[in-house]
Each structure stands twice: as structure tokens, then as C-alpha cells.
């Protein structure tokens, strides 16, 4: 009896509810344990003045249904945030509430699901970054993750600078003189805006500036700069901008020294390839050893080469020559 009573005591002493299993998708969707705890604290029980109209049998299960709806709202917010990671939290919350409206019919369940969406709103990214910096051990050298983030930020900034770079085009006017038109693509908030600056006339008194966010060009202001340039200076600038490297630099957005280095390296590679084709590999050379005097003498004595080619053999099967009897012939 003692052997049977010991396992029974162990079973009674063990907790009735099993330990909750860890969500395998928590690294991707985020931790929802805090939100679920808030749901359990938010719905401790139903007030006695609001019974369910369906019947008294469903009132004990109403608490579990609301808690389940709230926890499902936490999970829906995490899924919406994982699908649209770049969107704002307000947009993700709106999508979560719409999903709760589609999932539940009753107003209380929809409200509980929406409360789960509100409880799963993540902390601001600045606080998360501060926590990560606090958890990182102090070190004198930068880690690989910091170097990678710095490289990505540099690439993004260079790409944005390339998009917002200035492109210059030359147009032909009635007086046969080229007048530059400058177009600048810049970001204003979250919208891409184009600014066009036109230089009118050979001796301009005004610069026309146009801005085109999404509609036709609209003149916004007229500036009057004071230009004091001489004819020789203008001609020298035209000569500097008329070469090949300046033209390619304006069209590609790359600096002139990068284009010059690429051109110089390409010429060196072409010369190297042309020199490599003239030199053969060492294995293709035929090495002839010089002959000694005895080898030359042996070749001259032992050589039985015919001086003239032999005659072809006579054809034995040829018919004999035809003989005529002259005494039988009469003249």
C-alpha cells in the first residue's frame, strides 16, 4: 500500500496545469507574453449586472472567450507588423482592428480583440536602441554589426545624394548661344520634388526658378543675381566644360578623377593583353641540340640515299609486239 500511495501523493503535489510551451514564431513575430498577461489582468471577471442574453450556461465561459479574443488580438498585431514592417504603428493598429472586426461578430469580442491590438504596440525604436547599447559590453573597437550598419547608412546616403544631384543641360536659343538649364531633384519631406533653374539671355538679369512636385511647372520666384564676369572667364569655363570627362561626369554623376582612373586602367589592361598575345608559353618551344663532327661524318658515310629515283618495273602482262611478214605483201 505504501508503494501505491507514494505515486498518488506525487501526482497530487504536482501542478494541475502544464507549463506553457514557448511559441516557435516568437523570434519573428515578437513576444506576446506581456500582452497576454495584460489581457488576463484586464478581464478578471464579468460584472453581475450584464448577463449574457443567450442563457446562463454560457456566462462562465464568457471570461475565457474574452481573454482568448484579447490574446488573439495580440497575435494579430504581431502578424500585421511582421507583414508590413516598414509601416507606421498607427497603420498596423488599424489593420489589426479591421482583422478583429472580420474575425468576431459580437461587439464585446471585437472590443477585447482591439484591446489586444492596443496592448501589443511595441516600444519606440529609440528606447530599444538604448537598451541594446546598454546591454552591449564596452569595447574600444567597433563590432561587426556596427560596421555593417555604418556601411549600409553610407550607401543609403550616397544613393540619396546621387538622386538629389544636379544635372545640367545646354539648349540652343535664337541668338546661337548656349544657355544652361539646371534641374535639381531633391526630397521635400517624403515627396520627390524637381526644381528647374533657367538662365535667360546672354547677359541675364534674372534667374527663373520652377518647382514641379506632381503637376506642370509653376513659377514660384524670380531672383536677380549680380553677375560680374568677364568674357575671358566665361570662355575659359566653356572650354573646361566642353571636354569629354566633364561631359561624362555631368551625365553619370561621378567625379572626374573616378572616370580618369577607369579610363587609365582600361588602357593599361588593353596594353597588357596585347603584350601577352605576343609571348608564347615555354612548353611550345622546340629545342634543337647541335650535332658533333662525328655525328655529321656518320650521316655522310652511312647514308645510302639513291641519286635518282628508280625506274618503274616493266609491265609483264602487256601483249607482244605485232610482227608483219613482208614477203607475203605485194606492192
From Swiss-Prot:
The chain crosses the membrane at residues 258-278. GO terms for cellular component: Golgi membrane. The keyword Transmembrane helix applies. Residues 45-54 have a biased composition (Pro residues). Disulfide bonds: none annotated. Residues 1-21 form the signal peptide. Keywords: Glycoprotein, Golgi apparatus, Membrane, Signal, Transmembrane, Transmembrane helix. Its main location: Golgi. A motif (Microbody targeting signal) lies at residues 329-331. It is a single-pass type I membrane protein. Pfam families: BSMAP (PF12280). Belongs to the TMEM59 family. This is Transmembrane protein 59-like. It comes from Rattus norvegicus.
Amino acid at each position: 500500500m505504501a508503494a501505491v500511495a507514494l505515486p498518488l501523493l506525487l501526482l497530487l503535489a504536482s501542478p494541475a496545469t502544464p507549463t506553457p510551451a514557448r511559441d516557435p514564431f516568437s523570434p519573428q513575430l515578437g513576444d506576446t507574453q506581456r500582452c497576454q498577461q495584460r489581457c488576463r489582468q484586464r478581464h478578471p471577471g464579468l460584472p453581475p449586472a450584464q448577463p449574457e442574453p443567450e442563457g446562463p450556461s454560457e456566462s462562465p465561459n464568457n471570461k475565457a472567450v474574452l481573454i482568448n479574443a484579447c490574446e488573439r488580438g495580440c497575435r494579430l498585431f504581431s502578424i500585421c507588423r511582421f507583414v508590413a514592417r516598414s509601416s507606421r504603428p498607427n497603420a498596423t493598429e488599424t489593420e489589426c482592428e479591421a482583422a478583429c472586426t472580420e474575425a468576431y461578430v459580437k461587439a464585446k469580442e471585437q472590443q477585447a480583440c482591439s484591446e489586444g491590438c492596443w496592448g501589443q504596440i511595441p516600444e519606440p525604436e529609440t528606447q530599444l536602441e538604448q537598451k541594446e547599447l546598454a546591454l552591449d559590453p564596452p569595447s574600444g573597437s567597433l563590432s561587426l554589426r556596427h560596421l555593417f550598419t555604418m556601411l549600409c547608412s553610407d550607401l543609403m546616403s550616397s544613393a540619396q545624394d546621387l538622386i538629389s544631384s544636379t544635372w545640367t543641360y545646354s539648349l540652343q536659343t535664337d541668338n546661337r548661344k548656349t544657355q544652361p538649364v539646371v534641374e535639381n531633384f531633391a526630397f521635400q519631406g517624403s515627396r520627390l520634388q524637381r526644381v528647374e533653374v533657367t538662365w535667360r539671355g546672354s547677359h541675364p538679369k534674372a534667374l527663373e526658378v520652377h518647382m514641379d512636385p506632381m503637376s506642370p511647372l509653376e513659377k514660384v520666384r524670380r531672383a536677380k543675381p549680380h553677375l560680374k564676369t568677364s568674357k575671358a572667364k566665361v570662355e575659359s569655363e566653356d572650354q573646361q566644360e566642353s571636354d569629354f570627362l566633364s561631359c561624362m561626369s555631368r551625365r553619370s554623376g561621378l567625379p572626374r578623377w573616378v572616370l580618369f582612373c577607369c579610363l587609365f586602367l582600361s588602357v593599361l589592361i588593353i596594353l597588357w593583353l596585347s603584350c601577352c598575345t605576343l609571348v608564347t608559353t615555354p612548353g611550345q618551344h622546340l629545342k634543337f641540340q647541335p650535332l658533333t663532327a662525328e655525328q655529321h661524318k656518320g650521316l655522310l658515310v652511312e647514308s645510302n640515299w639513291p641519286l635518282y629515283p628508280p625506274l618503274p618495273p616493266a609491265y609483264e602482262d602487256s601483249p607482244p609486239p605485232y610482227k608483219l611478214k613482208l614477203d607475203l605483201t605485194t606492192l
